Swiss-Prot record:
GO terms for molecular function: hydrolase activity. It comes from the Bacteria. One of its GO terms (biological process) is carbohydrate metabolic process. The keyword Hydrolase applies. The active site is at 161 (proton donor). This is Unsaturated 3S-rhamnoglycuronyl hydrolase. Belongs to the glycosyl hydrolase 105 family. Keywords: Hydrolase, Periplasm, Signal. Its EC number is 3.2.1.-. Induction: By ulvan and rhamnose. PANTHER family: UNSATURATED RHAMNOGALACTURONAN HYDROLASE (EUROFUNG) (PTHR33886:SF8). Residues 1-25 form the signal peptide. Unsaturated beta-glucuronyl hydrolase involved in ulvan degradation. Ulvan is the main polysaccharide component of the Ulvales (green seaweed) cell wall. It is composed of disaccharide building blocks comprising 3-sulfated rhamnose (Rha3S) linked to D-glucuronic acid (GlcA), L-iduronic acid (IduA), or D-xylose (Xyl).
Length: 377
């Protein structure tokens, strides 16, 4: 009798295990494979350094934000080693244009290191503080609107990419140093950009004032006569919102604004996801360049997965889209680890190819993986 009961118990365990494995396989995610792909991407990118202006520029800033997020999720010291190595060789410096949001993006990684390495004197955030103070409080021609008003460069963050580059840094710095004034200043300038570039009907951001319709014949349009909304540009914004919310206090007085904006944009991005999982470079005219693009799609995947993992987005509605997107992103990675199908540096929709890559594309890939890994937890 005991033997029969033992056999029945063993059979139940085996059947249960088999069903669990089957369900896990149906979900289409394998943690070990995701982690391996992320490490391969890191190793390839570290062996093939690239930047637009300098090792402290925005392209490296975006890449090392991805490395930071990968470390935060996995705690794999390969990521931290890469972070510390670049910070050491950069001497903890930002790039040089104090009025330009792009040039402080690299500081996200410095602050992240400081939050995880408490050795006295190891991390130097003084260059970051000097940049942020000058960026927020010193006069410049963009704030004054002089000489650039014809181009719409009349506010500090006049292009939507800026909402990824500077606000998460200011927010993280406020958290790390316990100085909420930096978050309050961030909100002030964020609202300027929101009011100037956010299209409430489309629930998307124009990249800059060139693409904001004014009701004239000069309005820029896609071949299908629709507005031009750039995938990576909106990826910068939505990915940046997830970064902001992740480190923003739950009782922050303006948090509801950011949560609502995040959910509004997320719902629109979900509506625009193509069947193969990857968003096209032109969101409202996907046929213009009818192939997936990794940088925008990577930021969307990160943001949507973060929203699911943190209870802001409905799991049943968004998780299938996230998994489909991750599978498509993974298929864009070459055998050696290089992540292809990344649109080159630009400011509007352009094509990509299997062989086009950029460090910020790798960063987007790592960010996506860092949140997709959490879906099964």
């Amino acid at each position: 009798m005991k033997n029969q009961a033992l056999k029945i118990l063993t059979l139940c365990v085996l059947v249960g295990s088999a069903m669990s494995l089957k369900l896990y396989a149906q979900k289409g995610l394998n943690h070990s494979e995701i982690e391996a792909k992320m490490i391969k991407a890191l190793e390839w990118q570290e062996a093939h350094p690239i930047f637009a202006l300098a090792p402290t520029d925005w392209t490296e800033g975006a890449y090392y934000i991805g490395v930071s997020r990968a470390h935060k999720t996995t705690q794999d010291m390969m990521y931290m080693a890469a972070l510390k190595n670049q910070a050491y060789w950069n001497n903890w410096q930002t790039y040089s244009r104090l009025h330009h949001a792009d040039d402080v993006a690299i500081s996200y990684s410095y602050i992240y290191i400081g939050m995880n390495d408490k050795r006295p004197g190891f991390v130097n955030l003084e260059p970051t503080k000097k940049f942020l103070d000058a960026h927020l409080h010193e006069d410049d021609e963009w704030k004054a609107g002089t000489d650039k008003s014809a181009s719409g460069k009349t506010i500090l963050w006049w292009w939507c990419d800026a909402l990824f580059m500077a606000p998460p840094v200011l927010n993280l710095y406020a958290k790390h140093t316990n100085q909420p004034k930096y978050r309050d200043e961030m909100h002030k300038y964020y609202m300027e950009t929101y009011n100037q570039l956010y299209d409430k009907e489309e629930r998307l951001f124009a990249r800059d004032m060139r693409f904001v319709w004014k009701g004239t014949e000069k309005d820029l349009k896609e071949p299908n006569d629709k507005k031009i909304f750039w995938s990576r540009g909106n990826g910068w914004v939505l990915g940046g919102l997830a970064l902001l919310l992740d480190d923003m206090p739950n009782d922050y007085k303006h948090r509801t604004f950011y949560e609502n904006l995040f959910k509004d944009m997320a719902s629109r991005i979900l509506e625009l996801q193509p069947k193969d999982g990857l968003w096209r470079t032109s969101l409202l005219s996907p046929e213009t360049y009818d192939h997936g693009e990794v940088s925008g799609s990577g930021f969307y995947t990160f943001a949507l997965a973060w929203g699911v993992n943190n209870g802001l987005l409905d799991r049943n509605k968004y998780e299938p889209a996230v998994k489909k997107a991750w599978k498509a992103l993974a298929d864009c990675q070459h055998e050696d680890g290089r992540v292809g199908w990344v649109q080159n540096i630009g400011a509007s929709p352009e094509p990509a190819s299997a062989d086009s890559w950029q460090n910020f594309g790798t960063g987007a890939f790592l960010m996506a993986g860092s949140e997709v890994l959490k879906l099964e937890e």
